[in-house]
Design a protein with these regions (language model features):
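Long, C-terminal-biased catalytic regions of enzyme "large/alpha" subunits
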Residues: 1-85
């Protein structure tokens, strides 16, 4: 599976980039709003599955939208806000 970067280059999909970005957003929130490692892994896996189901290269923006949707689905509004910014 490929990702289309903002500069138009196609690169291999890397789930660890999602995990890292969501972890950073979660860590910046702190307290009870922080996500568990398991929740972060589940979000990354769900986004990966959604991207694979599209059967095409997806843009970075599409991946970010999917991550945001997953965060909102689990009511992680504070983490979503930090992820977006």
């Amino acid at each position: 599976m490929k990702i289309i970067k903002r500069n138009g280059a196609e690169v291999p999909f890397d789930i660890t980039k999602i995990i890292t970005a969501v972890t950073k957003a979660s860590d910046s929130v702190g307290g009870q709003s922080r996500l568990t490692r398991e929740q972060i892994t589940q979000i990354a896996a769900a986004v990966t599955d959604q991207c694979q189901a599209l059967n095409r290269a997806v843009s970075v923006e599409e991946v970010q939208d999917l991550v945001e949707n997953q965060l909102m689905d689990i009511q992680a509004h504070d983490v979503a806000r930090h992820y977006i910014t």
